[in-house]
UniProtKB/Swiss-Prot annotation:
Subunit: Homodimer.
Name of protein: UPF0210 protein LBUL_0934
Family: Belongs to the UPF0210 family.
HAMAP family linked: UPF0210
Organism: Lactobacillus delbrueckii subsp. bulgaricus (strain ATCC BAA-365 / Lb-18)
InterPro entries in the cross-refs: UPF0210
Gene3D superfamilies according to UniProt: 3.20.70.20
Length: 447
């Protein structure tokens, strides 16, 4: 291999915050279903601790051998609403506690899949699981929860949208930080390696390894070398950089899955920022030519970034999937935090940006007195963008008790901190309380 390219990669890791954001093992729990919940939980614990026994060990071996940092080791499982429904239990907290114990036993950072898919309606297990979310997140440390409330083919379940607004407020009363582990989706994907929205879909193999790459710092550094060039050159530079980053993800993912004896799933092409300086998606947009993220032109710059990352990534990897785009979490990106503190970046602008990027309103801190119906309306808006544009959108919103615009909340670690962002005071309650379903769009009829 060209020595220059090797040195380039070494420099990316040492100076530009390049890492693999996550190696995530997806495990099917369909063979753990049992009408006795105690037996089911034992089967779940046994399967996870057997299949993922060496996940952390192998990841650390690969870090040492290749010199590539792997920031997180995670697990996703089949949505628990499907697994627990056979039990007839009135709450599923014990399933969440079992997942937490298994995650700690194998040493992973997070485990996702305390989830329900209700985009067209509820089965009984979905209702029980959703009502269990606040207590489940209270009693666990590493469990992540997600609920899919809409899809392009099914429309939006507005009853579920209303309920999830209430669940967010219930979480706030217990511990507002618990909402960092809850994502409400439209068009959720089955092979997402990122948290908190990851779960292992029923169409997946028994066990699969999915990889999520990082690399905003690498992209920004590459763009610093093409100042003043046309947008064609900017897009091409991003493409070439994304190719290199994704190649690394494919290499580690395939080698890890081989050593673990499991299927290699996908590489998720998402640019995932962290609060560290130089690891920001917002800074990339500013390098493209914006004085601050959030000003006019932000959506166009983000659209180009997202598309160029995908074009570069799909050439580098045989299987791409997950969310695959730029993440724009408020609290996990130093540039986003700075723009939000100045009032340049607003919830409305973030909503517009989600129409062209990977996820949605992510890690948004809002005033503690925000009504449940307003949270539900934010979820509905994001779900509508996802439904109409045939893409994944999501909401991870954090109302903070006793805080208002001008205050901030410290999450710590990977979650960083977030200034409280203003939301509209005008009520959406009458619309949210209608319930029912928003029908699927006309262009969803593809057959």
């Amino acid at each position: 291999m060209d020595l220059r390219r090797i040195m380039e990669t070494v420099n990316m890791i040492d100076n530009e915050n390049l890492d693999l954001r996550t190696t995530t093992m997806g495990i099917s729990l369909l063979d753990c279903i049992d009408s006795d919940s105690d037996r089911a939980c034992q089967k779940i614990y046994d399967k996870i601790t057997t299949k993922a026994e060496n996940l952390v060990k192998v990841a650390r071996e690969l870090e040492t051998e290749y010199g590539i940092p792997i920031a997180n080791k995670r697990i996703t499982v089949t949505p628990i609403s499907l697994i627990a429904a056979a039990s007839g239990d009135s709450d599923y907290v014990k399933y969440a506690v079992t997942l937490d114990k298994a995650a700690k036993a194998v040493g992973v950072d997070l485990i996702g899949g305390f989830s329900a898919l209700v985009h067209k309606g509820y089965q009984n297990g979905d209702r029980v699981l959703i009502k269990s979310i606040p207590q489940a997140l209270k009693e666990t440390e590493r469990v992540c929860s997600s609920v899919n409330v809409g899809s392009t083919r099914s429309g939006i379940n507005m009853d579920a949208v209303k309920e999830m607004g209430q669940i967010v407020i219930e979480n706030e009363k217990i511990n507002p930080l618990n909402n960092g582990n809850l994502v409400i989706f439209c068009n959720a994907v089955e092979d997402n390696p990122f948290m908190a929205g990851g779960f292992h879909g029923v169409g997946e193999s028994d066990v699969a390894l999915n990889v999520g790459v990082s690399g905003p710092g690498v992209v920004k550094t590459a763009l610093e070398k093409v100042k003043g060039e046309s947008m064609d050159v900017v897009a091409e530079t991003i493409k070439q950089t994304a190719f290199k980053v994704t190649r690394m993800g494919q290499l580690v993912g395939q080698e890890a899955s081989k050593r673990l004896g499991v299927d290699f799933g996908i590489v998720d092409l998402s640019l995932a920022p962290t609060p560290a300086q130089g690891d920001s998606v917002a800074n990339i947009l500013e390098e493209i030519g914006l004085e601050s993220v959030g000003t006019h032109g932000t959506t166009a710059a983000l659209a180009m970034l997202n598309d160029a990352v995908k074009k570069g990534g799909i050439m580098a990897c045989s299987h791409v999937g997950g969310l695959s785009g730029a993440f724009i979490p408020e609290s996990e990106d130093a540039g986003m935090i700075a723009a939000a503190e100045k009032g340049i970046l607003t919830v409305d602008k973030l909503e517009a940006m989600t129409a062209v990027c990977s996820v949605g309103l992510d890690m948004i801190a809002v005033p503690g007195d925000t009504p449940a119906e307003t949270i539900s309306a934010m979820i509905a808006d994001e779900a509508a963008i996802g439904m109409i544009n045939n893409k994944t959108t999501a909401v991870r919103v954090i109302p903070v008790p006793g805080k208002d615009v001008g205050d901030s909340i410290e999450f710590g670690g990977l979650f960083g901190y977030a200034p409280i962002m203003p939301v509209h005071k005008e009520s959406s309650a009458a619309m949210i309380n209608r319930g029912g379903r928003i029908p699927a769009p006309v262009h969803s009829f593809k057959n």
